[in-house]
A protein has these predicted regions:
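Small-molecule kinase domains that catalyze NTP-dependent phosphoryl transfer to phosphate-bearing small molecules
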Residues: 123-168
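Conserved phosphate-donor/acceptor-positioning beta-strand/loop module used by diverse small-molecule
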Residues: 99-121, 155
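The conserved Walker
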Residues: 9
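Walker A/P-loop
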Residues: 14
Length: 175
């Protein structure tokens, strides 16, 4: 099984994923961003769009699926995947690829209102007011309105700690 934690930057995916992993027996965190970082390390760089966002490179989506499948085949259990996917076509490719391998997916979106997200990004000790993180607030809002919230279980983190959000997700997964 895969527990996918979607949402924009500042929603708490990375922190929450580590806490979810502790609450779900036999689970591991798989950061699909590392697959993208590998693609970005190819020299000279890959052609086409993607230099600013590796998700635009067509190999990224099937490589995420294949990596997840191989890890689950090898280790079993559950993968917790903290990864923003705001392009509906990309989510469809990933979810269809996982379905082809009969891998069940619980798709959660960690949501917070725009003011809360901006405050979290401003207060991030690793990179306060990151332009990279801020540029995804509007695309997230658009995806949330048009498709994302309808495709996932929404966890509003506006007034939740990461531990509270993780508990809510783990309880939903465990049934």
């Amino acid at each position: 099984m895969i527990v996918w934690l979607n949402g924009t930057h500042g929603a708490g995916k990375t922190t929450t994923s580590g806490l979810v992993q502790q609450l779900i027996p036999d689970s591991r965190v798989f950061d699909a961003e590392k697959v993208g970082e590998t693609l970005m390390d190819i020299k000279p760089g890959l052609p086409g769009p993607g230099a600013d966002n590796f998700q635009h490179w067509p190999p990224w989506r099937p490589l995420v699926v294949e990596t997840a499948r191989r890890v689950l085949d090898y280790a079993g259990g559950t993968l917790v995947v903290p990864m923003t996917v705001l392009v509906e076509q990309y989510w469809r490719e990933i979810s269809a690829g996982l379905a082809q391998h009969a891998i069940p997916v619980r798709h959660f979106v960690l949501h917070a209102d725009q003011d809360t997200l901006r405050g979290r990004i401003a207060g991030d000790i690793l990179g306060p007011n990151s332009p990279f993180r801020l540029q995804y607030l509007e695309p997230y809002a658009e995806a949330a309105r048009t498709w994302l919230h309808a495709e996932a279980e929404v966890v509003d983190t506006t007034h939740l700690t990461p531990a509270e959000a993780a508990l809510q997700i783990a309880e939903a997964v465990k049934g």
